[in-house]
Amino acid sequence: MKLTLGEAARISGGRLVGGTPGTEATRVCVDSRRARPGDLFVALPGDFADGHTFVEAALRAGAAAAMVTRPVVDLAGAPLGPLLVVEDPLAALRALGAWVRDVADPIVVGITGSTGKTSTKDLLASVAGVRFRTVAAERSHNNELGVPLTLLQTSEDTEVLVCELGARGPGQIRDLCTYVRPQIGIVTNVGVTHYEQFGSVDAIVAAKSELVASLPEGGVAVLNADDPRVAGMAGVTAAEVLTYGLDEGAPRTARPWLSGEAVEVDALGRPSFRLVRGDEHREVRLGVSGRHQVSNALAAATAGLALGMSLDEVAAGLERARSSPWRMEVTERGGVVVVNDAYNANPTSVAAALGTCAAMVPPGGRFLAVLGYMAELGV
């Protein structure tokens, strides 16, 4: 992202105070501890802290300006600046993100689902990066704040942008899609994550299908054939539908467009499998842990093929992918293997993690699970 403070003021509907319109901002930052020269620091209000408190620290770190909702002074009462004064920081970020997305004009892949969004995002970023200049969401940036921040990572040479799209209520994914405008959409699965907010699995299905329904006629919907609720979303889109799934001998009405076969898992939980598309196949050994990662890899592979990549390129990208921190993160020291999957939890992901860990225990070994509370399940 590169834009002048004058452009930022015009796009966001804000007012520049104490700055030069031609000064260039090269990055958006919402954490003053990570501020660096050239940043536009956004002072967000929060439940535990107000970003306006940290404007001075961000400017001292070299930030080009701070986006605020009111004038800010230092401890001596002197006005701080440059400031970009806006009414609503989230609305301003959304406007800036939409503008940068339109200027960069990459191919945008949106990913949603109850579980597997971040892992699929990491796998797809690695796959697309084999051929394309690719930008992907950091960590789990998938809401009304994280999605604009992801868009603002792009530049004019970005070819593929991978976005996570989350929801805690009806209409949220549809709203995100109005300015993300994905051409490819992936739905990983439907489970009971955020059941408390939705009230029923049917409502969760409807929310996740908003991504598929938002795709253009020339787009591609990538759907999990192993989840009937996801496969059923084919009926709500004008886009081409490509399915993926595991071929484990169970009867099917139709073979997935892309399938995974002969899954095996090594001592550290890392799966290998055969990637099959029509008469072609490639052997793939993942660098991430968990048998469930094969489904995420198939989703990423299908999207990679939809981007025009070869099966060889896709396989190479899958093999070099690594997990985000705290997501089935495996470390080994002194004969003890620690699997850190503490970023978030829901019944589906916990069952997958426990299954992976149990399979890693050698004969005579022990398996200890440290489990926390799972929220937003409506129970």
How should each PLM-predicted stretch be described?
Residues 30-31, 43-45, 68, 136-138, ...:
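Thr-Gly-centered strand-to-loop micro-motif
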Residues 12, 62, 78-80, 130, ...:
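Short, structured coil segments at secondary-structure junctions
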Residues 90-225, 229-237:
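Phosphate-binding loop of NTP-binding sites
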Residues 8, 39, 58, 96, ...:
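Residue-level signal for inorganic ion chemistry
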Residues 1-95, 99:
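N-terminal leader/targeting and accessory segments in enzymes
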Residues 69-77, 186-337, 364-365:
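Acidic, Mg2+-coordinating active-site environments of NTP-dependent enzymes
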Residues 33, 56-57, 174, 202, ...:
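Alpha-helical segments flanking ligand/cofactor-binding loops in enzyme cores
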Residues 46-49, 324-326, 342-379:
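Active-site beta-alpha connecting loops in nucleotide-dependent enzymes
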